[in-house]
Amino acid sequence: MPPGPDMTLELACGQAPVCGVDEAGRGPWAGPVSAGAVILDPDRIPKGLNDSKKLSAKARAALEEEIKDVAISWCVGLASIEEIAQLNILHAAGLAMRRAVEGLAVTPAFALVDGNYAFKLPCPVKTVIKGDSLSCSIAAASILAKEARDRIMIEADALYPGYGFAGHKGYHAKVHVEGLRRLGPSPIHRLGWAPVKAALAAAAVNGELDL
């Protein structure tokens, strides 16, 4: 098993404090995109940190609580479906990241950002491919971003039943396609996305929509 993330990249920045930044929700067909920004205390690193996608829901929930308790500062930023439509998903993710960093109680000297795109943030940026598997700060940010977005989608399931948002969180799933074909788009669907268009087009042809 490969080793988990550590603080090597944070220390290599040569400046402090360093925040980790990561997003959640670039791929779904519905809901906002979220981003977490976390400045960890090097002396209080939660055990078990890793890429949020590699953790169980129970582990993520426990780590989210611990991260918020021990971090020097943390914040989650969002970009709405309207902003996604206006800016495109890449730049909307960057907007969510900027909001997360700007919301920190402590101004970071440096930001480690997951991926290979250097978004414009309120501090110098270093991109890290697969950063959520390498950097504790990025891993922590990925957990906060995912947990925050998952809660939004669970709430959306109660507001807009029939799509299965609580289960798939807006991603591709059979129940999601069936809901779109039967009900049409909800107010939180990303209407410009090809899978949404395709499901609606198929429903129109087959007369499946409950209008």
UniProtKB/Swiss-Prot annotation:
EC nos: 3.1.26.4
Residue stretches making up the RNase H type-2 domain: 16-205
Keyword NAD: no
One GO-annotated biological process of the protein: DNA replication, removal of RNA primer
Cited PROSITE patterns: RNASE_H_2 (PS51975)
Pfam families documented for this protein: RNase_HII (PF01351)
Listed GO MF terms: manganese ion binding; RNA binding; RNA-DNA hybrid ribonuclease activity
Enzyme class: hydrolase
Residues annotated to bind a divalent metal cation: D22, E23, D114
Keywords (A to Z) from UniProt: Cytoplasm, Endonuclease, Hydrolase, Manganese, Metal-binding, Nuclease
Coiled coil: none
The protein's required cofactors: Mn(2+); Mg(2+)
Cofactor note: Manganese or magnesium. Binds 1 divalent metal ion per monomer in the absence of substrate. May bind a second metal ion after substrate binding.
First-listed, main subcellular location of the protein, grouped into a coarse class: cytoplasm
InterPro entries per UniProt: RNase_HII (IPR022898), RNase_HII/HIII (IPR001352), RNase_HII/HIII_dom (IPR024567), RNaseH-like_sf (IPR012337), RNaseH_sf (IPR036397)
A single GO cellular-component term on record: cytoplasm
SUPFAM superfamilies assigned to the protein according to its UniProt record, in alphabetical order: Ribonuclease H-like
Keyword Hydrolase recorded: yes
Reactions catalysed: Endonucleolytic cleavage to 5'-phosphomonoester
Family: Belongs to the RNase HII family.
Function as written in the Swiss-Prot or TrEMBL entry: Endonuclease that specifically degrades the RNA of RNA-DNA hybrids.
Protein name per its UniProtKB record: Ribonuclease HII
Source species of the chain: Caulobacter vibrioides (strain NA1000 / CB15N)
Gene, per the UniProt record: rnhB
